[in-house]
């Protein structure tokens, strides 16, 4: 009696294993063939008042922002985002915005854009899960309107960026093509807990590990990478985590991530302030507008 039961159990396990393999392969194929990819529409609601052909910038800083973050944008305009020349190289900063359902906020941003001429906007609703759309909008703008930029940095509104030190390191690096750096994430796994801010379902991304990518709080790349990422973006399955999506594009392009310096320079988790320390970092997260102004004044003095 024991032998037939064992044989039946063995057959059941084989069938179960075959079914698991089938559904696993099916989900992978579905992921590869799914139609939900980034679509290029080319329609901008707002474009900045700048001509990169006339004055090619060394570094373009693209800052993701929202309508409610006026204080953050104003603080950045007064500090690291102010148009300037560092070591003879021109730097320019632009803010990436979607749309809002608030008529009052829309009007305020219209006026802000006319006043400062530094806002890039398309017709998608602002929100955390549209950051991929927002980032790709900035990359598309560089591809179409500012391919002359030597380097591009994508960062967020709650960041301190040491543009002087970043420029110094980029000049020392002397890399002008296929260069990508930031806070490297080389062994990250999808979060499957539904209540997490970074939750990604199996249907969105069936694999158990992400490709190498850089923290979305701040990464830097050579100008040619913008066009390469933009051109390949429609062939890469869309994922709402913008830094992972860019990592998927880089994997498709076979562009490897590099360290900017032998010492840590990107701090997505924040860092205690000191003048000496902040003179030798590139990026620090969780900086409020008033704090940014205070830090900048301390560094200038």
Swiss-Prot record:
Signal peptide: none
Lineage: Eukaryota, Metazoa, Chordata, Craniata, Vertebrata
Organism name: Pan paniscus
Catalytic activity: a globoside Gb4Cer (d18:1(4E)) + UDP-alpha-D-galactose = a globoside GalGb4Cer (d18:1(4E)) + UDP + H(+)
Enzyme type, top EC level: transferase
Cytoplasmic side: 1-7
EC number from the UniProt entry: 2.4.1.-
Stored InterPro entries: Glyco_trans_31
Any matching Pfam family: Galactosyl_T
Pathway participation: Protein modification; protein glycosylation
Subcellular location: Golgi apparatus membrane
Lumenal side: 29-301
GO terms under cellular component: endoplasmic reticulum; Golgi membrane
Name of the protein described by the UniProt record: Beta-1,3-galactosyltransferase 5
């Amino acid at each position: 009696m024991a032998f037939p039961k064992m044989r039946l159990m063995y057959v059941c396990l084989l069938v179960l294993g075959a079914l698991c393999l089938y559904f696993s392969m099916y989900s992978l194929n579905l992921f590869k063939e799914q139609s939900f990819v980034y679509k290029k529409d080319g329609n901008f609601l707002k474009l900045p008042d700048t001509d990169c052909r006339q004055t090619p910038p060394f570094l373009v800083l693209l800052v993701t922002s929202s309508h409610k973050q006026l204080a953050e944008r104003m603080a950045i305009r007064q500090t690291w985002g102010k148009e300037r020349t560092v070591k003879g190289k021109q730097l320019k900063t632009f803010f990436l915005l979607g749309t809002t359902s608030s008529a009052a906020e829309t009007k305020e941003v219209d006026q802000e854009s006319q006043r400062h001429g530094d806002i890039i906007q398309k017709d998608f609703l602002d929100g955390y899960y549209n950051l991929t759309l927002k980032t790709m909008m900035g990359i598309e703008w560089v591809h179409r309107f500012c391919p002359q930029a030597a380097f591009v940095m994508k960062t967020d509104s709650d960041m301190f960026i040491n543009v002087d030190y970043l420029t110094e390191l980029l000049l020392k690096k002397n890399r002008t093509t296929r260069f990508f750096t930031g806070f490297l994430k080389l062994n990250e796994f999808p979060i499957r807990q539904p209540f997490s801010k970074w939750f990604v379902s199996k249907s969105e991304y069936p694999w158990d590990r992400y490709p190498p990518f850089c923290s979305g709080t701040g990464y830097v790349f050579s100008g040619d990478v913008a066009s390469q990422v933009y051109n390949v973006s429609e062939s890469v399955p869309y994922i709402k985590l913008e830094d992972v999506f860019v990592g998927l594009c880089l994997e498709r392009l076979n562009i490897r991530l590099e360290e900017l310096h032998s010492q840590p320079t990107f701090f997505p988790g924040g860092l205690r302030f000191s003048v000496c320390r902040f003179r030798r970092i590139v990026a620090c997260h969780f900086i409020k507008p008033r704090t940014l102004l205070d830090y900048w004044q301390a560094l200038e003095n």
